[in-house]
């Protein structure tokens, strides 16, 4: 398969360029970065694209890719419900084209989200702390937002988090994502980390994942690239590829 990388000169993008070049069954057809024309992808007969760019440009990228029938594996975050709906609208006009958007491609991170969903109904309280490098554009992270939504779904019908806080500084209790407090840390020296904290009478449970290097995303991205065209339309997350449902 001929694979292009968008955001090829970024830290994650450069890692993906190396990963595709090292994969015997994939051919690196294009390296596209800010200022480069997207037409490079069609001129090089690119079949699938890995996008690690920026929330400000990812929608324009996807519109071009879908219009040209190029499959997309997207690690760029910042996807609101409205953005997802727009992508689905574009895909409806190109039913054979596939887009996979994942908040995280690290296998351990995906498993930690799965474990959090399993644990959620058994605890009274749940909060999330996500920690990333200071260059990250969005907060909270896509992974934390997705984790919070999964926890909220698993706790549907149960009592909300107990919290007697009546006075606080703005933001002191974190962002409220479907009733789950999410706290974002941006600190030099970090890559990507998340703690999910659960508590109930007499015990707590912490589920933590650490990406210590951007190569942690490679196995999940390559899995998605190799299988994306098997799933026309929109897929959210790599859980279906790992049989985690």
Curated annotation (Swiss-Prot):
Domain of life: Bacteria
Enzyme class: oxidoreductase
Key words, A-Z: Amino-acid biosynthesis, Cytoplasm, Diaminopimelate biosynthesis, Lysine biosynthesis, NAD, NADP, Oxidoreductase
GO biological process: diaminopimelate biosynthetic process; lysine biosynthetic process via diaminopimelate
Pathway terms, separated by semicolons: Amino-acid biosynthesis; L-lysine biosynthesis via DAP pathway; (S)-tetrahydrodipicolinate from L-aspartate: step 4/4
Signal peptide interval: none
Residues at which (S)-2,3,4,5-tetrahydrodipicolinate binds: 133, 142-143
GO MF annotations in UniProt: 4-hydroxy-tetrahydrodipicolinate reductase; NAD binding; NADP binding; oxidoreductase activity, acting on CH or CH2 groups, NAD or NADP as acceptor
Role of this protein: Catalyzes the conversion of 4-hydroxy-tetrahydrodipicolinate (HTPA) to tetrahydrodipicolinate.
UniProt name for this protein: 4-hydroxy-tetrahydrodipicolinate reductase
């Amino acid at each position: 398969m001929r694979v292009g990388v968008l955001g090829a000169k970024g830290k994650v993008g450069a890692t993906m360029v190396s990963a595709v070049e090292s994969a015997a069954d994939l051919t690196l057809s294009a390296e596209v970065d800010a200022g480069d024309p997207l037409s490079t992808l069609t001129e090089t007969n690119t079949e699938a694209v890995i996008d690690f760019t920026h929330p400000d440009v990812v929608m324009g990228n996807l519109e071009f890719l879908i219009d040209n029938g190029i499959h997309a594996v997207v690690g760029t975050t910042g996807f609101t419900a409205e953005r997802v709906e727009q992508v689905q609208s574009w895909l409806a006009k190109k039913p054979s084209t596939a887009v996979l958007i994942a908040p995280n491609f690290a296998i351990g991170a995906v498993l930690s989200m799965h474990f959090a969903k399993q644990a959620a109904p058994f605890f009274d309280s749940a909060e999330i702390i996500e920690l990333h490098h200071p260059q990250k554009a969005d907060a909270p992270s896509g992974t934390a937002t997705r984790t919070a939504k999964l926890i909220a779904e698993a706790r549907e019908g149960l009592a909300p988090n107990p919290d007697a806080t009546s006075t606080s500084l703005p933001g002191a209790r974190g962002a409220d994502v479907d009733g789950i407090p999410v706290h974002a840390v941006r600190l030099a020296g970090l890559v990507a980390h998340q703690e999910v904290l659960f508590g109930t009478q007499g015990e707590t449970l912490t589920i933590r994942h650490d990406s210590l290097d951007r190569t942690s995303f490679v196995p999940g991205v390559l899995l998605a690239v190799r299988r994306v065209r098997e799933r026309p339309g929109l897929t959210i997350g790599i859980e279906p590829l790992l049989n985690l449902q």
